[in-house]
From Swiss-Prot:
InterPro entries attached to this UniProt entry: Carotenoid_Oase
Residues annotated for Fe cation binding in this entry: H276, H325, H390, H563
Organism: Arabidopsis thaliana
Swiss-Prot/TrEMBL keywords: Abscisic acid biosynthesis, Chloroplast, Dioxygenase, Iron, Metal-binding, Oxidoreductase, Plastid, Transit peptide
Cofactors (names): Fe(2+)
Catalytic activity: a 9-cis-epoxycarotenoid + O2 = a 12'-apo-carotenal + 2-cis,4-trans-xanthoxin; 9-cis-violaxanthin + O2 = (3S,5R,6S)-5,6-epoxy-3-hydroxy-5,6-dihydro-12'-apo-beta-caroten-12'-al + 2-cis,4-trans-xanthoxin; 9'-cis-neoxanthin + O2 = (3S,5R,6R)-3,5-dihydroxy-6,7-didehydro-5,6-dihydro-12'-apo-beta-caroten-12'-al + 2-cis,4-trans-xanthoxin
Region (Disordered) residue spans: 1-25
Enzyme Commission number, as recorded: 1.13.11.51
GO molecular function: 9-cis-epoxycarotenoid dioxygenase activity; metal ion binding
Coiled-coil intervals: none
Induction / repression: Low induction by drought stress.
Listed name of the protein: 9-cis-epoxycarotenoid dioxygenase NCED6, chloroplastic
Cofactor note: Binds 1 Fe(2+) ion per subunit.
Deletion consequences: Plants exhibit abscisic-acid-deficient phenotypes in seeds, but not in vegetative tissues.
């Protein structure tokens, strides 16, 4: 694998491509499908040349003589002992850089704001603001294994103004980890999934500890990558991943991005939070979880009011640290998954990964009252054959007999360790309804849509914690790429699809409501990559009929990424720094 990053990974300039303004038609099959045809007008070239993306230029810190000697010695230990140990370990596809950083998963350089982008169609006037999407984009070549989740966080931003005026930019989130590695000009922080495996992983940890001991690096200021989730709360855009505190990112008046710094909610917390906090649309409160792999309590539930003040900090008792990427809220409760992927650092001593799939473990959901102060009244309900990496919504109902029920909508993945290891089994991700009877402590799971992988999506955020009808979700086929968007009526299983077309793939769709009308009155947006023509686009789809209304040709390649959000014009004005 080539390890020379940046210039060799810049997109090649190609001739102007045809672009789509679909005239969808209904396919006569069991599900209503609106197909995007490929008869499309031609986009003109950009009116002016686009400058090459900028990169962070390493500047080396001033070391005293003893530090230089120690650093040189540790470098020799790395090259003569640690790296050979890592190279002797066969890499499965989920941690093989040749796989994880291939094609449109490869990293790109930062791109300053590019204005005056070509738009085909008309962007609705209600969409004034900035679409933000987070993703993993390693600054430096991996030294050994590399998992998709290990890359440095990079945010891609599409700013939409009046009269079809659109700009684009992308910037690294300047985490403490990235700032230190940039100063050193190389990767030095351990990659939690790609590198921390077996004895070579222990050696990598020992090497990092030694470098920290001589003052070359400092892990106390944060070791996270902030590459997964984004949320706008209390005047702040926060980028986050489960390995650290969030990072605040400023969106300036030109649509550029600037990292403000690590954000501990005004020093009210000092531990990492998960990538998917929930903002209650009714109260405005932010709910989240924080877990600690090394010590108890392994999990805490946190709540912040609209002013950003922490109003709940509740310990959740778990027998072992569990990987939790997402959770759900209802009007009165918090729904917490405790599933089969757990952390066991002792497995590294035995030559394995610290993130393991415990096949015999029974998945369960904990239901905690938002008013609970101690966590002692949490109710656990077993949910067999269930592993949900993402939960899309939850709400409260009652059975005909009057039993209280929590309804959870999530994507159930099989095998559960698909993302982390090679099981040899085909991946299935089933959009499911999970019903938790709070009187009988029994559960029932029903697959809403069969025969298609549905993962990474949005609902109308006004319905978070309340009964909803629709979810807009990526069609993850061929796995792990996404070939289109499915609008799913979760009440009756009806599906409408917007397909990107041959050799065209995207990611998580982002739903933006239009006013306060019907639940599906709004627009779905996201990035699309044409792998055959080597071009990237930003598309906007009418959520009611799943027809494309506008598309923007982007000046640079946008890699596949993770999660996004839309920051409205009013929210931009409310930013605080």
């Amino acid at each position: 694998m080539q390890h020379s990053l940046r210039s060799d990974l810049l997109p090649t300039k190609t001739s102007p491509r045809s672009h789509l303004l679909p005239q969808p038609k209904n396919a006569n099959i069991s599900r209503r499908i609106l197909i995007n045809p490929f008869k499309i007008p031609t986009l003109p070239d950009l009116t002016s040349p686009v400058p090459s993306p900028v990169k962070l230029k390493p500047t080396y810190p001033n070391l005293n003589l003893l530090q230089k000697l120690a650093a040189t010695m540790l470098d020799k230990i790395e090259s003569s002992i640690v790296i050979p140990m890592e190279q002797n370990r066969p890499l499965p596809k989920p941690t093989d850089p040749a796989v994880q950083l291939s094609g449109n998963f490869a990293p790109v350089n930062e791109c300053p704001v590019q204005n005056g982008l070509e738009v085909v169609g008309q962007i609705p006037s209600c969409l004034k603001g900035v679409y933000i999407r987070n993703g993993a984009n390693p600054m430096f070549p991996p030294l050994a294994g590399h998992h998709l989740f290990d890359g440095d966080g990079m945010i891609h931003a599409v700013s939409i103004g009046f009269d079809n005026q659109v700009s684009y930019s992308c910037r690294y989130t300047k985490t403490n980890r990235l700032v230190q590695e940039t100063a050193l000009g190389r990767s030095v922080f351990p990659k939690p999934i790609g590198e921390l495996h077996g004895h070579s992983g222990l050696a990598r940890l020992a090497l990092f500890t030694a470098r920290a001991g001589i003052g070359l690096v400092d892990g106390t200021r944060g070791m996270g990558v902030a590459n997964a989730g984004v949320v706008f709360f209390n005047g702040r855009l926060l980028a986050m991943s489960e390995d650290d505190l969030p990072y605040q990112v400023k969106i300036d008046g030109q649509g550029d991005l600037e990292t403000i710094g690590r954000f501990g909610f005004d020093d009210q917390i000092d531990s990492s939070v998960i990538a998917h906090p929930k903002v209650d649309a009714t109260t405005g409160d932010l709910h989240t979880l924080s877990y600690n792999v090394l010590k108890k309590p392994h999990l805490r539930y946190l709540k912040f009011n609209t002013c950003g003040k922490k109003t709940r900090d509740v310990e959740i008792t778990l027998p072992e640290p569990t990987m939790i990427h997402d959770f759900a809220i209802t009007e009165n409760f918090v729904v917490i998954p405790d599933q089969q992927m757990v952390f066991k650092l002792s497995e590294m001593i035995r030559g394995g990964s610290p993130v393991i799939y415990v096949k015999e473990k029974m998945a369960r959901f904990g239901v905690l009252s938002k008013q609970d102060l101690t966590g002692s009244d949490i109710n656990w309900v077993d949910v067999p054959d269930c592993f949900c990496f993402h939960l899309w919504n939850a709400w409260e109902e009652r059975t005909e007999e009057g039993d209280p029920v929590i309804v959870v909508i999530g994507s159930c993945m099989s095998p559960p360790d698909t993302i982390f290891s090679e099981s040899g089994e085909p991946t299935r991700v089933e959009l499911s309804e999970i019903r938790l009877n709070m009187r009988t402590k029994e559960s029932n799971r029903k697959v809403i849509v069969t025969g298609v992988n549905l993962e990474a999506g949005h609902i109308n955020r006004s319905y978070v914690g309340r009964k909803s009808q629709f979810v807009y979700i990526a069609i993850a086929d061929p796995w792990p790429k996404c070939s289109g968007i499915a609008k799913v009526d979760i009440q009756n299983g009806t599906v409408s699809e917007f397909n990107y077309g041959p050799s065209r793939f995207g990611g998580e769709p982002c739903f933006v409501p239009e006013g306060e009308g019907e639940e599906d009155k709004g627009y779905v947006m996201g990035f699309v990559r044409d792998e055959e023509k080597d071009e990237s686009e930003f598309v906007v789809v009418d959520a009611t009929d799943m027809k494309q209304v506008a598309a923007v040709r982007l000046p640079e390649r946008v890699p596949y990424g993770f999660h996004g959000t839309f920051v409205s014009e009013n929210q931009l004005k409310e930013q605080v720094f």
